[in-house]
UniProtKB/Swiss-Prot annotation:
Keyword Cytoplasm tagged: yes
Name the record gives this protein: P-granule-associated protein deps-1
Bias type Low complexity, positions: 563-592, 600-619
Keywords associated with the record: Cytoplasm, RNA-mediated gene silencing
Tissues showing expression: Expressed in germ cells.
InterPro entries per record: OB_DEPS-1_1st, OB_DEPS-1_2nd, OB_DEPS-1_6th
Disulphide bridges: none
One GO cellular component term: P granule
Gene name linked to the record: deps-1
Organism: Caenorhabditis elegans
Length: 619
């Protein structure tokens, strides 16, 4: 090879197998092509290595010392091993015969080992988000068993053991190679930038093909202005840091920890592994409801943190869980009306999307002293930013349920706003629907403010019938019809200093900001709508959600999942006398997190709902 060629090589390959016995007179090993001319090589190409590749060239010209020449000759004759990477140039191979004539050994790239099934390689790769049993690697894509797929997070650079097998005897044979997933090995936080090598992340800002958008900064430090914000403006505290160390988190299943102090972030276990506990050193998996100290690093792909250190905290009592893997806790009304907190104050805000406790505040025991046993489900920040728990079922509340079945009571006078044909909501009772009869609608248009008195009928779960009402111009707001019953309302909101997900309206109470950023000021105008229904319950933490802070009405795509499309606006059961048992059975059917700590997480299904269990892929 020339001096120029020794610095750059056209091809890179990895040794997969020895050649067949009939071909060993001319070839020694089979090499799978993985890179050509600095780019990913075309798939399904295998070369044989000629015996002459182990004979050094130009010994006399390069060495005057005979001992050095002998050492070079001896090193050149060392046989290739499974998993070893070699380099060669265009002039060093015969493409027609699929044979390599001269090689350059590369430093070790892949760790090789063996299992009871054969030789295996430790290869880095990424689980595909849209197909959670597909593991992409720079060498090939393999299919994992579901039991392994549930242990790992998609879009994280993980190391796994993969078995490569071929029935080829020489480079001229028809291509045949099978890659089989064996098991996961580890996750290294320092390698997470390699996630952008996956084809679906080519446009990521972290990718070498992406460009960071620069932040505008003054050219001179003298140009900086240091003044206090105006009175009444709220500047949210920025708790973000690239690395979080030794925080306390609650494991809620599906490789997710929630930290009460940093509830706006997800803390994800990228690769779930068992750990030993107790004197018998039995290996167990984390259980739902356990507390851990953890350290984590920021991940742009997940818009959250990946945990790289996890230590159990045995001194803190574990939460009780249901058979569905949800947390069982006693809840009490929170200071934010319509929401709840657990009695011990360890979880943070809890919402009630199924309206199971909408009449909780009217019980004679009093708003501040009544407690309910509830089954709550944790959600990721993509569903709720800071209200991280949702009530899916209540139990052990026979006294409250008997009271609901037999009791009538009167509410009002209170002020609210009419949001559709037959529904009024108010800030004082934000999780209750008030139904306005046809004979009282005159003079109160949709979007109009109303002062009313309502009467609750026995057996009705989450609505109260209005018996008296009159217009309230102070609460009337501008509204805009998108299509059918879908309407947008422009109201003034105030941000909540403690919970950036929530803002408060005088006429509607607290509303959910979803993924929008809360403006840093006192009062501001925003367009709100009734929350969309997902899985038979509202997606937002409150009845109303913000869709824009622009002055003009936003363009909203109509969805079949809107609340008006899926239910009559009465109770969650779709009937003004809906059964609480039917509501709770649907609520408990929501996706829950569960795991067996001795055998690992439960099976995960693909987005199509079809389980996948095949473990090998033909490349």
């Amino acid at each position: 090879m020339s001096e120029r060629q020794s610095k750059y090589f056209d091809y890179q390959g990895i040794v997969i197998s020895s050649t067949g016995q009939d071909n060993q007179d001319s070839e020694t090993d089979l090499v799978y092509l993985i890179q050509a001319h600095g780019k990913a090589a075309p798939k399904n190409i295998m070369y044989g290595v000629s015996k002459c590749a182990f004979v050094p060239t130009n010994l006399e010209r390069n060495f005057d010392n005979i001992e050095e020449a002998k050492n070079l000759e001896r090193r050149s004759k060392i046989p290739l091993k499974f998993g070893e990477v070699i380099l060669w140039n265009e002039s060093d191979c015969d493409h027609d015969k699929r044979i390599i004539l001269h090689i350059k050994r590369e430093k070790p790239i892949y760790e090789a080992s063996s299992s009871r099934n054969g030789l295996i390689l430790k290869v880095g790769g990424v689980i595909q988000p849209t197909s959670t049993t597909s593991f992409w690697t720079p060498l090939c894509t393999v299919t994992m068993p579901e039991t392994e797929a549930t242990r790992a997070e998609p879009d994280v650079w993980l190391y796994a053991w993969i078995r490569f097998e071929t029935t080829m005897k020489s480079g001229l044979d028809p291509f045949n190679m099978t890659a089989t997933f064996e098991s996961f090995d580890s996750c290294d936080p320092s390698d997470q930038a390699r996630v952008c090598e996956a084809p679906w992340n080519a446009g990521s800002p972290d990718s070498k093909f992406g460009v960071w958008r620069p932040d505008p900064k003054p050219a001179d430090s003298d140009d900086e202005i240091d003044i206090e914000p105006r009175e009444g403006w709220h500047l949210p505290e920025d708790k973000w840091a690239e690395v979080i160390k030794m925080q306390l988190g609650l494991y809620v299943g599906e490789r997710l920890l929630i930290c009460k102090e940093l509830s706006q972030f997800d803390f994800i276990i990228p690769l779930q592994k068992p750990f030993s506990r107790g004197t018998d050193k039995t290996l167990i998996y984390p259980a739902v409801g356990e507390y851990f100290h953890f350290s984590a690093i920021w991940s742009m792909q997940h818009n959250g943190f990946l945990i790289y250190e996890l230590q159990p905290v045995p001194l803190l009592r574990q939460h009780v869980t249901s058979v569905n893997g949800n947390l069982l806790t006693r809840v009490v009304p929170a200071s934010i009306r319509g929401l709840f907190v657990d009695k011990e104050g360890t979880l943070g805000l809890i919402d009630d999307p199924h309206h199971l406790l909408s009449f909780f505040e009217f019980h004679p025991a009093g708003y501040e002293f009544l407690k309910a046993m509830a089954e709550v489900r944790a959600v990721r920040t993509s569903e709720n930013k800071s209200v991280r728990y949702r009530i899916v079922r209540t139990s052990g509340m026979s006294i409250f349920e008997n009271w609901l079945r037999d009791t009538q009571f009167v509410v009002g006078p209170v002020k609210g706003i009419r949001i559709n044909e037959d529904t009024v909501i108010c800030a004082k009772h934000p999780n209750v629907y008030f139904k306005i009869p046809n004979n009282l609608k005159e003079g109160i248009p949709i979007g109009g403010g109303v002062q009313f008195v309502g009467k609750r009928q026995a057996g009705v779960d989450s609505e109260i019938m209005i018996t008296e009402c009159s217009p309230c111009p102070a609460f009337t707001c501008k509204n805009y019809s998108v299509s059918g019953d879908t309407r947008l309302f422009q109201v003034y909101l105030k941000p909540n200093c403690d919970h950036e997900q929530l803002a408060e309206s005088d006429s509607m109470g607290f509303v959910d900001f979803r993924e929008l950023e809360t403006p840093c000021r006192g009062k501001f105008l925003a367009w709100v709508r009734e929350s969309i229904t997902v899985n038979d319950c509202r997606r937002a933490a409150t009845i109303m959600e913000v869709c824009s802070t622009a002055i003009c009405p936003p363009l909203i795509a109509m969805s079949a999942n809107s609340s008006r499309a899926t239910s009559a606006r009465t109770t969650p059961a779709g009937s003004s006398i809906g059964s609480r048992s039917s509501i709770q059975s649907r609520a408990s059917a929501a996706t829950s997190v569960s795991s067996n700590r001795f055998v690992g997480p439960s099976s995960r299904r693909t987005p199509s709902g079809t389980p996948q269990s095949s473990t090998s892929s033909r490349v």
